[in-house]
Amino acid sequence: MEEQNDFTWAVKNGDIANVKKSVEAKKDLISITDGNKRGPCHWAADFNQVEVLEYLISKGAKFDNTDDYGITPLLAAVYEGHTGAVELLVKKGANKSVVGPDGQTAYDAAEKADIKALLK
């Protein structure tokens, strides 16, 4: 459990060295979820940890999955206004037409013009 907590902290805080060390020691960490079915890509997108997010995706982490609320990593990044995370997820092929729990698409939910441009 402590290993998962350390990994989660490293992902959220952009500690790429410890993220890599953890994944190299235990690859299945890229597939863990919390009590709301949020995984590492959700956390990285939510905190705009683009380097971590790119690494996780390169190791096979799911980045189009929904949590218990119907939120994908892309929606998490859009809701937080994190252009870098949105740009990476779109580049990697995230579903741009996903609809969030509020009934809005990622494009409709975006408040920043640069994010809207990425989602067109």
Swiss-Prot record:
GO cellular component: cytoplasm; nucleus
Ranges of the ANK repeats in the UniProt entry: 1-31, 36-65, 69-98
GO molecular function: protein-containing complex binding
Location, primary (coarse class): cytoplasm
Alphabetical UniProt keywords: ANK repeat, Cytoplasm, Nucleus, Repeat
InterPro entries xref list: Ankyrin_rpt, Ankyrin_rpt-contain_sf
Family according to the record: Belongs to the myotrophin family.
Function: May regulate NF-kappa-B transcription factor activity. Plays a role in the regulation of the growth of actin filaments. Inhibits the activity of the F-actin-capping protein complex.
Descriptive protein name: Myotrophin homolog
Protein source organism: Dictyostelium discoideum (Social amoeba)
